[in-house]
From Swiss-Prot:
One of the protein's GO biological processes: mitotic cell cycle
Full protein name: Myb-related protein B
Keywords recorded for this protein, A-Z: DNA-binding, Isopeptide bond, Nucleus, Phosphoprotein, Repeat, Transcription, Transcription regulation, Ubl conjugation
One annotated GO molecular function: DNA-binding transcription activator activity, RNA polymerase II-specific
Gene (UniProt): MYBL2
Function per UniProt: Transcription factor involved in the regulation of cell survival, proliferation, and differentiation. Transactivates the expression of the CLU gene.
Residue stretches making up the HTH myb-type domain: 26-77, 78-133, 134-184
Nuclear localization signal (motif): residue ranges: 411-417
Glycyl lysine isopeptide (Lys-Gly) (interchain with G-Cter in SUMO2) crosslink site(s): 104, 194, 197, 275, 411, 447, 482, 499, 509, 523, 533, 546, 584, 596, 625, 639, 648
Taxonomic lineage: Eukaryota, Metazoa, Chordata, Craniata, Vertebrata
Cellular compartments per GO CC: cytosol; Myb complex; nucleoplasm; nucleus
DNA-binding region(s) in UniProt: 54-77, 106-129, 157-180
Length: 700
């Protein structure tokens, strides 16, 4: 029975009718249903302005677009639209047009039927006029299939209808809502369906990761399979609880290899699938969908397809290697291609099995394999109150023979490095296999963080700030904490091999690494003299500083020690050290001489004692320094006056001495040169014409 998909006829989308009128419109302003007032307004506008400009008509509706208005008129409000029952003439016309144009050109067929849409013609054909549609009464077998399929698929009526040849999805839905649902709710249908009837198996396909989709029925084979094997693998389920589902798959003892292979090959009696694959030709594995057989009794069993048959052939070729489940390990994040209906079971097995040489099935010792399922897997498997079987695929390697390529879900388990304690290293009884088994968790592994995330938040405090600003020095400090500006770095010109005659512990980096390095020529030249070290200043520091200031800033640095002859008359024992501080040379030479001269003129009673605090001496020096900075040396001719002023501190409350006439004359511009310059300036300003923006300067 051919079915039409939703996107077969694109030009018919303009004439489809829905409740909201805008299900396929992505740019719609409003997805609410049309009101009666809107319908009346649209009728009046179409009657007044016609159907030419739908944008103009949509401008009268604040929440409607032009497409919404057009769809509403053509599918619902158009008076020429026929919504009544179909006549015999219309049915006969549809049958003739379908024979002529096929079941795809519904828009073209609707043009031959006045007042009918393409959607109406399509539904009339598929639901009533199609000769393949059954119109007979529903049988008990069909009711049982619908009930069991509804438990698995839910309200997916199109897929359920594919399991019943001759029944449409609309008919199945109506029959469920009218008859079967009432029986299921009352419990009468369940008692009738358990009367020793074989279970129903539903063939489903997983195509392109789109979830469960039922297979298309073909000639000679339907989707309903009643001749499934007499003893299929089942799971006893009394209550659909996660604990019982986990317990059903938790413990399972391995049988000998013969019985193990028989259990895997149980779906073999289904002979219709290999025949179908042989008839149609085996497509490549990439395009072959996954096939599953859903038992109505709540199981999901993999059907025998080409991929499963290839896996069985590989297992038969080398059963010893394929049955060693200790080589299998599931990845943490499976890919999307390997996920079945967006849920993949993550298995972790702890194996206690001795490794035996291959090709010895009789010597194989049975062992116990445990499987653990996490909560998400159990919830996915128990969805719709039905459990599912979990398929297990073989490993990537086939006993070293490398035959074929098994599924990529399983990978070879990586060897783990085990850090043994000294006691364990000396013991010879512990094997590598036992150590791996001891690492296998006995419950669902949960990765715990070795730290708390809150350790990285709010960790900064005042103590850390102080430690960063002034960290405590170790026994071998790498560098000084504060760089002294006046202490430059000099490179020692002595080669390293001539510096130390005694033995020096070599650097660990270079003692351990004997491989030749290829430093640059500049590094080669610098490594000869060693690293930079702070060395004491040389006696030529002042000369170098004067040369730099003279060349760059044009400043001539004059040091008083070289000018004044009194310093050369001192005794050799009282001479200064040739190494001088730069700040003394720049600022304190002149002040030092004046202080010494003043201190020599002061009486002994006023001289400062040697035990005076340092702040008083600094006060005296700063005051004299300020005096020298304010006055030019040309005004410091009266040395006895300065000494006399310094002698005044005998009485602390006396008034200061009045200003001398000579000082007043110089300070107030009363000298002859100053008066001459003032007169010249007055004459120059008098010649200038006053302007509106200029200021008036009044000279008295």
């Amino acid at each position: 029975m051919s079915r039409r998909t939703r996107c077969e006829d694109l030009d018919e989308l303009h004439y489809q009718d829905t409740d909201s009128d805008v299900p396929e419109q992505r740019d719609s302003k409003c997805k609410v249903k049309w009101t009666h007032e809107e319908d009346e307004q649209l009728r009046a506008l179409v009657r007044q302005f016609g159907q030419q400009d739908w944008k103009f008509l949509a401008s009268h509706f604040p929440n409607r677009t032009d497409q919404q208005c057009q769809y509403r008129w053509l599918r619902v409000l158009n008076p020429d639209l026929v919504k009544g029952p179909w006549t015999k003439e219309e049915d006969q016309k549809v049958i003739e047009l379908v024979k002529k144009y096929g079941t795809k050109q519904w828009t073209l067929i609707a043009k031959h039927l006045k007042g009918r849409l393409g959607k109406q013609c399509r539904e009339r054909w598929h639901n009533h006029l199609n000769p393949e549609v059954k119109k007979s009464c529903w049988t008990e077998e069909e009711d049982r299939i619908i009930c069991e399929a509804h438990k698995v698929l839910g309200n997916r009526w199109a897929e359920i209808a594919k399991m019943l040849p001759g029944r449409t999805d609309n008919a199945v839905k109506n029959h469920w809502n009218s008859t079967i649902k009432r029986k299921v709710d009352t419990g009468g249908f369940l008692s009738e369906s358990k009367d020793c009837k074989p279970p129903v198996y539903l063939l489903l396909e997983l195509e392109d990761k789109d979830g469960l989709q039922s297979a298309q029925p073909t000639e000679g084979q339907g989707s309903l399979l009643t001749n499934w094997p007499s003893v299929p693998p089942t799971i006893k389920e009394e209550e659909n609880s996660e604990e019982e589902l986990a317990a059903a798959t938790t413990s399972k003892e391995q049988e000998p290899i013969g019985t193990d292979l028989d259990a895997v090959r149980t779906p073999e009696p289904l002979e219709e699938f290999p025949k179908r694959e042989d008839q149609e030709g085996s497509p490549p594995e990439t395009s072959l969908p996954y096939k599953w057989v859903v038992e109505a009794a709540n199981l999901l069993i993999p059907a025998v397809g080409s991929s499963l048959s290839e896996a069985l052939d590989l297992i038969e070729s080398d059963p010893d290697a394929w049955c060693d489940l200790s080589k299998f390990d599931l990845p943490e994040e499976p890919s999307a291609e390997d996920s079945i209906n967006n849920s993949l079971v993550q298995l972790q097995a702890s194996h206690q099995q001795q490794v035996l040489p291959p090709r010895q099935p009789s010597a194989l010792v049975p062992s116990v394999t445990e499987y653990r399922l996490d909560g998400h897997t159990i919830s996915d498997l128990s969805r719709s109150s039905r459990g599912e079987l979990i398929p297990i695929s073989p490993s990537t390697e086939v006993g070293g023979s490398g035959i074929g390529t098994p599924p990529s879900v399983l990978k070879r388990q990586r060897k783990r490095r085990v850090a043994l304690s000294p006691v364990t290293e000396n013991s010879t009884s512990l094997s590598f296999l036992d150590s791996c088994n001891s690492l296998t968790p006995k419950s669902t592994p949960v990765k715990t963080l070795p730290f708390s995330p809150s350790q990285f938040l709010n960790f900064w405090n005042k103590q850390d700030t102080l430690e960063l600003e002034s960290p405590s020095l170790t026994s071998t400090p790498v560098c000084s904490q504060k760089v002294v500006v006046t202490t430059p770095l000099h490179r020692d010109k002595t080669p390293l091999h001539q510096k130390h005659a005694a033995f020096v512990t070599p650097d660990q980096k270079y003692s351990m690494d004997n491989t030749p390095h290829t430093p640059t020529p500049f590094k080669n030249a610098l490594e000869k003299y060693g690293p930079l070290k702070p060395l004491p200043q040389t006696p030529h520091l002042e000369e170098d500083l004067k040369e730099v200031l003279r060349s760059e800033a044009g400043i001539e640095l004059i040091i008083e020690d070289d000018i004044r002859p009194e310093k050369q008359k001192r005794k050799p024992g009282l001479r200064r050290s040739p190494i001088k501080k730069v700040r003394k040379s720049l600022a304190l030479d002149i002040v030092d001489e004046d202080v010494k001269l003043m201190m020599s003129t002061l009486p002994k009673s006023l001289s400062l004692p040697t035990t005076a605090p340092s702040n008083s001496s600094s006060l005296t020096l700063s005051g004299i320094k300020e005096d020298n900075s304010l006055l030019n040396q040309g005004f410091l001719q009266a040395k006895p006056e300065k000494a006399a002023v310094a002698q005044k501190p005998r009485s602390h409350f006396t008034t200061p001495a009045p200003m001398s006439s000579a000082w007043k004359t110089v300070a107030c511009g009363g000298t002859r040169d100053q008066l001459f310059m003032q007169e010249k300036a007055r004459q120059l300003l008098g010649r200038l014409k006053p302007s509106h923006t200029s200021r008036t300067l009044i000279l008295s």
